[in-house]
């Protein structure tokens, strides 16, 4: 069994118990890793504190970081470094788009809505990687959550699909840029999961049903399955893997 004792990871993007990032946290926790969590708003901190009761973490390392603020990202990671020292990796599961930009026609996306989705869902990985690098002097791993809508046009995914496409390109360029520092950057393309974010996608139940009917495994995946792949990518088991996008979607990406 993989042992991640003496490893420290920052997890970004837990909103509630259904969050993909919480599935990642549960797996890393079971493997013995020390976990550091970031959140955006105070209500998210309260939710995190409740969820921590389900984990085996001896201390609660919680930091408020709004990724739309350079200052908060810079200061947040600086404080993490002061409190816990160097880290071994980051799991980035942050994305946002306005509801109207997900439900309407893509061609009607506003400039403001387009840029907002890009800023939170893609650029945030760039600045997070820049600051996290300072805490990984001997190398490490950064993993981001994406979705098939970044590779293909998926009905009702709209502006978020474009943001995920940007995120996936971001992963590749960060992998190239940070490779000499022995920092690997990868993505996990997770199948549709009932998360808080998924509520904004129109026809989500239809998407879930299509996976059950057409995917090779004939079922949908869950947060913990994504967490298992994240553990692989964040650990030394994947030491030769970077710039990759691994699909955890019951094989749906492989069929027509």
Curated annotation (Swiss-Prot):
<comment type="pathway">
    <text>Lipid metabolism; fatty acid biosynthesis.</text>
</comment>
<dbReference type="InterPro" id="IPR036291">
    <property type="entry name" value="NAD(P)-bd_dom_sf"/>
</dbReference>
<keyword id="KW-0443">Lipid metabolism</keyword>
<keyword id="KW-0275">Fatty acid biosynthesis</keyword>
<dbReference type="GO" id="GO:0030497">
    <property type="term" value="P:fatty acid elongation"/>
</dbReference>
<keyword id="KW-0276">Fatty acid metabolism</keyword>
<keyword id="KW-0444">Lipid biosynthesis</keyword>
<protein>
    <recommendedName>
        <fullName>Enoyl-[acyl-carrier-protein] reductase [NADPH] FabI</fullName>
        <ecNumber>1.3.1.39</ecNumber>
    </recommendedName>
</protein>
<feature type="binding site">
    <location>
        <position position="164"/>
    </location>
    <ligand>
        <name>NADP(+)</name>
    </ligand>
</feature>
<feature type="site" description="Critical for cofactor specificity">
    <location>
        <position position="40"/>
    </location>
</feature>
<feature type="binding site">
    <location>
        <begin position="19"/>
        <end position="20"/>
    </location>
    <ligand>
        <name>NADP(+)</name>
    </ligand>
</feature>
<dbReference type="Pfam" id="PF13561">
    <property type="entry name" value="adh_short_C2"/>
</dbReference>
<dbReference type="GO" id="GO:0042802">
    <property type="term" value="F:identical protein binding"/>
</dbReference>
<keyword id="KW-0520">NAD</keyword>
<feature type="binding site">
    <location>
        <position position="97"/>
    </location>
    <ligand>
        <name>substrate</name>
    </ligand>
</feature>
<feature type="binding site">
    <location>
        <position position="13"/>
    </location>
    <ligand>
        <name>NADP(+)</name>
    </ligand>
</feature>
<feature type="active site" description="Proton acceptor">
    <location>
        <position position="147"/>
    </location>
</feature>
<dbReference type="InterPro" id="IPR002347">
    <property type="entry name" value="SDR_fam"/>
</dbReference>
<feature type="active site" description="Proton acceptor">
    <location>
        <position position="157"/>
    </location>
</feature>
<keyword id="KW-0560">Oxidoreductase</keyword>
<comment type="subunit">
    <text>Homotetramer.</text>
</comment>
<comment type="similarity">
    <text>Belongs to the short-chain dehydrogenases/reductases (SDR) family. FabI subfamily.</text>
</comment>
<feature type="binding site">
    <location>
        <position position="94"/>
    </location>
    <ligand>
        <name>NADP(+)</name>
    </ligand>
</feature>
<dbReference type="GO" id="GO:0141148">
    <property type="term" value="F:enoyl-[acyl-carrier-protein] reductase (NADPH) activity"/>
</dbReference>
<comment type="function">
    <text>Catalyzes the reduction of a carbon-carbon double bond in an enoyl moiety that is covalently linked to an acyl carrier protein (ACP). Involved in the elongation cycle of fatty acid which are used in the lipid metabolism.</text>
</comment>
<feature type="binding site">
    <location>
        <begin position="66"/>
        <end position="67"/>
    </location>
    <ligand>
        <name>NADP(+)</name>
    </ligand>
</feature>
<feature type="site" description="Critical for cofactor specificity">
    <location>
        <position position="41"/>
    </location>
</feature>
<feature type="binding site">
    <location>
        <begin position="40"/>
        <end position="44"/>
    </location>
    <ligand>
        <name>NADP(+)</name>
    </ligand>
</feature>
<feature type="binding site">
    <location>
        <begin position="193"/>
        <end position="197"/>
    </location>
    <ligand>
        <name>NADP(+)</name>
    </ligand>
</feature>
<keyword id="KW-0547">Nucleotide-binding</keyword>
<dbReference type="GO" id="GO:0050661">
    <property type="term" value="F:NADP binding"/>
</dbReference>
<dbReference type="GO" id="GO:0004318">
    <property type="term" value="F:enoyl-[acyl-carrier-protein] reductase (NADH) activity"/>
</dbReference>
<keyword id="KW-0521">NADP</keyword>
<dbReference type="InterPro" id="IPR014358">
    <property type="entry name" value="Enoyl-ACP_Rdtase_NADH"/>
</dbReference>
């Amino acid at each position: 069994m993989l042992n991640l004792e003496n490893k420290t990871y920052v997890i970004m993007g837990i909103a509630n118990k259904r969050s993909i990032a919480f599935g990642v946290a549960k797996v890393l926790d079971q493997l013995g890793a020390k976990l550091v969590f970031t959140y955006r708003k105070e209500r998210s901190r309260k939710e995190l504190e409740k969820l921590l009761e389900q984990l085996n973490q001896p201390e609660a390392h919680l930091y408020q970081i709004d990724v739309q603020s350079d200052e908060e990202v810079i200061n947040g990671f600086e404080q993490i470094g002061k409190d816990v020292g160097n880290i071994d990796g980051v799991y980035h599961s942050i994305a946002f788009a306005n509801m109207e930009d997900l439900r309407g026609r893509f061609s009607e996306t506003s400039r403001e809505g387009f840029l907002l989705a890009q800023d939170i869902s893609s650029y945030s990985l760039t600045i997070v990687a820049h600051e996290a690098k300072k805490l990984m002097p001997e190398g490490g791993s950064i993993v981001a959550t994406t979705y098939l809508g970044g590779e293909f046009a998926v009905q009702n995914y709209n502006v978020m699909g474009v943001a995920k496409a940007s995120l996936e390109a971001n992963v590749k360029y960060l992998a190239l840029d940070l490779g000499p520092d022995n920092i690997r950057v990868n993505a996990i393309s997770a199948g549709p999961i009932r998360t808080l974010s998924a509520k904004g996608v129109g026809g989500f139940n239809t998407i879930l049903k299509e996976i059950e009917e057409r995917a090779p495994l004939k079922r949908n995946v869950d947060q913990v399955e994504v967490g298992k792949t994240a553990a692989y990518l964040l650990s030394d088991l994947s030491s030769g893997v970077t710039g990759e996008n691994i699909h955890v979607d019951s094989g749906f990406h492989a069929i027509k």
